[in-house]
Amino acid sequence: MSAHGTNEGALWGGRFESGPAAAMAALSKSTHFDWVLAPYDVRASQAHARVLHKAGLLGDEDLASMLDGLGRLAADVASGEFVPSESDEDVHGALERGLIDRVGPEVGGRLRAGRSRNDQVATLFRMWLRDAVRRVAAGVLDVVDALATQAAAHPSAVMPGKTHLQAAQPVLLAHHLLAHTHPLLRDVQRLRDFDVRAAVSPYGSGALAGSSLGLDPEAIAAELDFDSSAENSIDATSSRDFAAEAAFVLAMIGVDLSRMAEEVILWSTPEFGYITLADAWSTGSSIMPQKKNPDVSELTRGKSGRLIGNLTGLLATLKAQPLAYNRDLQEDKEPVFDSVAQLELLLPAITGLVSTLEFHTDRMAELAPAGFTLATDIAEWLVRQGVPFRVAHEAAGACVRVAEARGVGLEDLTDDELAGVDPALTPDVREVLTVEGSIASRNARGGTAGIRVAEQLGGVRQLSESLREWCR
């Protein structure tokens, strides 16, 4: 028997006379994706060694030797000198092999006492994910800050607000840009909330029933920066709701980015003409020399579907698994790893795109009153004069009909035409028949009036900075 047992590169084997068939080994192998957990595995092993020593299961010399070996192994993993071999089943088996190669089987073989791959991988996955979501959150906040900077640069620019993609009411461009920051800020808050639930360590739960060796799960939890250890060992080793929760928030970020990306695509068309994309954040055509394509936005739309697919695939994997651990859970990591990787590609590109958008404010101002976007202002002006809204709504609609028949805007109707629709429509109504007047009148909290948008911008920046403290 070799120093590594009857099944080198795996953490099992004594029950078996020989190793697995080649097809079985290929099916079981996970080092091609779980190697990203290697630094966390080494760190957790160092904590585990100290707990074994505290419990009297590892002598002083063996502890020193083991920690020295783990330190050298960590350095070799970081440098790329130590990598999985073809025989390694997973990251855990590879690292145990690496440790034994450095300190020998007598010392290296003691590390496995009191822990199972079941509690080990559940812990490492949480550790990795807690770090990963902070990186993602920081990237989301970069997008938020880019939007806020653009909003601050265009404090009085106006544009047509839309519902159903049809002209609705005029709004400030800054108000529209900030509307994209709020869902993204909520996404970061969701990641922060997720972290509270993820900060519970499964370590010490063993395969499913806990440990009989007098180990201290709370000590390991504290050393690995968890808030506490798990209360139920079965739940700790078999639950992956933390992964599903993270996958949902990552997918939601993709959805929120895709909504903004769709607008960038539309706004950059000649039909809209709101924006010009920077050369650095667009591409050309292999046959049409005039093209300037919004590939960042289109890839964002596409990758948002991928993130949703990762979420639904993970949920399908988790569905109907009996307690406790099942090998199905080998499939839990790749969807989440991929979602994080896709967002780490997307977020810097979206930030660069937003930061360099050139807004054509004259074009937006020209279109702001188009489509009779001031009709609601007529109705609400009448309400302020004491006219019931039902009547006011009818009168405003009649004004639209008259203007449409003449081929003019509402602001071009004569005093006689307005009075002919409703005597209450005196010349004073013209105070709201301008885009600027309409916007200024919407000064309730959350409205598009400049004073409210300025307050909102300050709040967005303050919240973004506060959330960055958590990311660090």
UniProtKB/Swiss-Prot annotation:
Q: Does the keyword Calcium apply?
A: no
What does the entry give for GO biological process?
arginine biosynthetic process via ornithine; L-arginine biosynthetic process
Q: State a single Pfam family of this protein.
A: Lyase_1
Annotated GO molecular function terms are: argininosuccinate lyase activity
EC annotation?
Answer: 4.3.2.1
Pathway recorded for this protein: Amino-acid biosynthesis; L-arginine biosynthesis; L-arginine from L-ornithine and carbamoyl phosphate: step 3/3
Provide the catalytic activity annotation.
2-(N(omega)-L-arginino)succinate = fumarate + L-arginine
Q: What class of enzyme is it?
A: lyase
Q: Which family does it belong to?
A: Belongs to the lyase 1 family. Argininosuccinate lyase subfamily.
Show the NCBIfam families listed in the entry: argH (TIGR00838)
Name the PANTHER family for this protein: ARGININOSUCCINATE LYASE
**The name this protein goes by in its record:** Argininosuccinate lyase
Species of origin reads: Rhodococcus jostii (strain RHA1)
Gene that encodes the chain: argH
